[in-house]
């Protein structure tokens, strides 16, 4: 069988960045998704990014990956700021009608294991798949040769900036590596391979003024956090069933439910100081450097501090919790981590009961007498003790501070 030419394979993987799609998606994000999920969205450090762009620098944005909202928050803001950026996205996201939307938003496909193509159009792809036609297959080995050529086209001929999520998790039992969102809440290590390839492409293109921009997207509460426990478990749901429910919950149920209950949370996006592309440092060391730079940008909310200060216990006296909070705050201040939400206008630490009350409002879904929605409790407290009813969710937010506090 004759192999398809390389240009055909690259066309199947490429983005279709266009203003019409980005403008439409931006409108939906700002008037429904962001409005439904978040009470406050703050961007820090974007002015310096604009200055770098005006100076002619090529920018590679390296964020941690906590939520599906990460790329939408970033691409929406970058697009509205005139920073033309394309996104490296996993092949599992390009399904059905979402394929042209993602490509129109500047997403190009990266193949993790194997991807089968039946047509360049998603409708014909589904029809050809149903009819049993022979597909074009791109496996991991083939993609390792195509990836540098994708980047050369994007960074060279097209002149875009790049947004990459290089974080990965390793299954403790099977050893399988998973790229994408952190299901555990941990601040995942970054793949050295991504930095090896990008740096080699920059060198081949003779782009010497490129900078890696660390980005931290910190959520007071991740919109789709309740899904992650099931995604980590070996359930009977097929991949496509998980995919459909994931997107239904993340982009429809979560915004509607949080708007109805008025349980919107805060999110902060911080752009850090640019790190010049260094062609001499080892990729593993550079990946750890970028991870550390991202870690320094996080913002600590009441939820992360309280859940981490419980030390994995289900019941804890308030006195002991207050002592743990003070000890953790001391460590966070030593690392110069942003803890501003924990302090009032006069610079005083918020009372413990006030912080617990905030967490209760965000993490306890009360019963609605008008519209029956799922009811559950994560945390409760009385005069003397704090009780955890959802240890998996508490552990997820506790893990968010482990990387910086364990340094």
Briefly describe each language-model feature range:
Residues 1-407:
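Membrane-interfacial terminal anchoring regions of lipid-handling membrane enzymes
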